[in-house]
């Protein structure tokens, strides 16, 4: 008996590594001192006076179930990168490098390489290097054809350039940056609504969406790195990545208890997919705002005097941005 008899194919793993190398190489920067395949990756920090390292880890959640149903694996890697780098940039940091963890019951290189291509694409969009990862073949641990993903990102910022959310005060403006869709949160509810309660198939064409349901649900999470870079000349007082917990749980994470975010509903167009979920699932409005991004994937808080400049900068790079509310004196939280 050998390891392959037990369900672990080392040769398949080595084959995948060779397939990954040229993909990852396209993301590398001059700071990366060694290529893919070593025991550890080396990254040189240059031109910083008082650097602060910022880290984040995340996954894609049950959005992966949609990828399995569609047998489409080239976009969930973008989601993985987005979930990590969008958390990094709210501190004022820029992403430096990324690592991934791919685990499956039986390794299929053709599937894994599609996932890695998506991760590499996400890294290119975010301007960070894919410097390593782990592929784990775990017989009997996952259902056939399924896998799980985790991502790890490290960024950097000068200490004096860290965003200080303590400066947020009454009257400050809340700018919302448009999402690309559902992003990567709320998919357990999404699947319940569409597939269990209403018996949809991922292949069903949805006239309101103009596409098949599966394609709409797999729309990759938007990466906001370049959008936030466009605002670097302005004083950003705070940012919130609208992920699990939606508006209700994420915006208060950057607010003192004596102030609240007053959101002006109707100041942006809520994408059709959310209206569909709410109607088909008979979901209360506040629950929608606590589960989904509702069309706003990133919130930026600035002084009112900086609003016009911020919108000009964002619109100039093709970013859809809206003034969606203001900071008010209150017991904290979000006022809809």
UniProtKB/Swiss-Prot annotation:
Name of the protein in its database record: Phosphoribosylformylglycinamidine cyclo-ligase
UniProt KW Amino-acid biosynthesis keyword: no
Lineage, broadest ranks: Bacteria, Bacillati, Bacillota, Clostridia, Thermoanaerobacterales
Annotated organism of origin: Thermoanaerobacter pseudethanolicus (strain ATCC 33223 / 39E) (Clostridium thermohydrosulfuricum)
Domain of life: Bacteria
Compartments it resides in: Cytoplasm
EC primary class: ligase
Associated pathway: Purine metabolism; IMP biosynthesis via de novo pathway; 5-amino-1-(5-phospho-D-ribosyl)imidazole from N(2)-formyl-N(1)-(5-phospho-D-ribosyl)glycinamide: step 2/2
Main location: cytoplasm
Keyword terms of this UniProt record: ATP-binding, Cytoplasm, Ligase, Nucleotide-binding, Purine biosynthesis
EC nos: 6.3.3.1
Pfam families named among the record's database cross-references: AIRS, AIRS_C
Matching InterPro entries: PurM-like_C_dom, PurM-like_C_sf, PurM-like_N, PurM-like_N_sf, PurM_cligase
HAMAP family in UniProt: AIRS
GO BP terms: 'de novo' IMP biosynthetic process; adenine biosynthetic process
GO cellular component: cytosol
Keyword set includes Oxidoreductase: no
Family assignment from sequence similarity: Belongs to the AIR synthase family.
